[in-house]
Amino acid sequence: GVGEIAISDHRSSHPTEEELIRIASQARMGGLLSGKAGIVHLHMGDYESGLDMIMDIVKKTAIPSSQFIPTHINRTSRLLDQGIEFCRMGGRIDLTAGFEENENSPDCIPTWRALNICLDSGVDIDNISMSSDGNGSVPVFDEYGNIQSIGAASCQVLFGDLKRMIEKCNIPIDIGLRTVTINPARILRIDNRKGAIRTGYDADCVLLDENLNICAVFARGKNVLTF
C-alpha cells in the first residue's frame, strides 16, 4: 500500500488527479500480486475540496472506492458529510480519536458524535474504523499559517474515545469494538489472523474489568502487561 498521502491540506505536496490515479493503480496491482490489500491511505486536511478528487477518480476510472482509506474524516462537518457519501459509493472511512472542538479546530467532530452521525445516516458499521494517529505531529498555526508550536498525538486517546462511546453515548460495546478490531483487520486484509478471538488467530487481547478499565494486555497469547 501507499500512505499517508496528504490531500486538501496546506501541508500536502498537492498531487494531481492523474498522479493519484497512477499511485492507486500501482498500489492495487501490487496488492493483487502479493495477496495484500494495496490500500492508498489518505491524510485528509480541512480545505474545502475535501474528498472531491477521490470521488471523481472513483466515478471516472475502474479503481474501486475500497482502494482508498481517508483518515481524519471527522476533521470538519463538511468532510464527514463527504465521507458518508463516499461510503454510499462503496468506500470506507477512518475516524481519528482525540479530535475535539477547540479554538484552532472549531468544526472538529469528536469520534463518538461522528460515529453516531454516520450510523444515523445509514453507513454500515463494517465500513468505519477508528485510529489514534498516535505519535503523529500536532502543529498549531496562527491565522497567517505560521507554525506556533508542535506536539505529538497521544496513543491513549483511542481507548479513551472507545470507552466514551460505550459509557456516555450508549453505543453498544460490540458496535464500538468493531471500529478498532475486525474492521481495520478486514480493511488491511489481515482478518485471517487479526481482529477477532478465534482458533488459530494471533491472540492479541486487551482484557477489561466491569468498569471498562484495562486490566491486562496479551500479544500473541503472551501476557505483556497487567494492571
Task: For the regions a language model picked out, list residue spans one by one.
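Metal-cofactor-binding active-site regions of metalloenzymes
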Residues: 1-13
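Active-site core of metal-dependent hydrolases
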Residues: 10-141, 147-148
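His/Asp/Glu-enriched, well-ordered alpha-helical/loop segment
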Residues: 120-201, 205-207
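Short, small/polar residue-rich loop motifs at catalytic or cofactor-binding pockets
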Residues: 210-212
